[in-house]
Amino acid sequence: LNVLCNNPHTADCNNDAQVDRYFREGTTCLMSPACTSEGYASQHECQQACFVGGEDHSSEMHSSCLGDPPTSCAEGTDITYYDSDSKTCKVLAASCPSGENTFESEVECQVACGAPIEG
């Protein structure tokens, strides 16, 4: 999921012309006048960037998100996992996997678990 999907568009373009661009609005992409550097040129481009496989999966949670978080261990590495209490993805330093609740990156965790994308 592209972090630009959560960026709001602005009305002030500093004398640049506004054009119709597409922005994520909930579970779809809608057109709105914006600066040329914002949003996406087409609805398809917006959907491909903002939704897994072009579809909204925000209400679905991958089963690995519900597993046990990693545990601390001496020979471990930084592991990203889903924290079901805070409903966010976190990184635990010097940890070892203790189940399926491990992800290659924070973005992968956020997409799989429906956690908010920050940025």
From Swiss-Prot:
The lineage of its organism: Eukaryota, Metazoa, Ecdysozoa, Arthropoda, Chelicerata. Disulfide bonds join 5-50, 13-35, 29-46, 65-113, 73-96, 89-109. Tick salivary thrombin inhibitor that plays an important part in the anti-hemostatic strategy of ticks. Is a potent and highly selective thrombin inhibitor (Ki=10 pM). It comes from the Eukaryota. Expressed in salivary glands. Its main location: cytoplasm. This is Ornithodorin. The keyword Secreted applies.
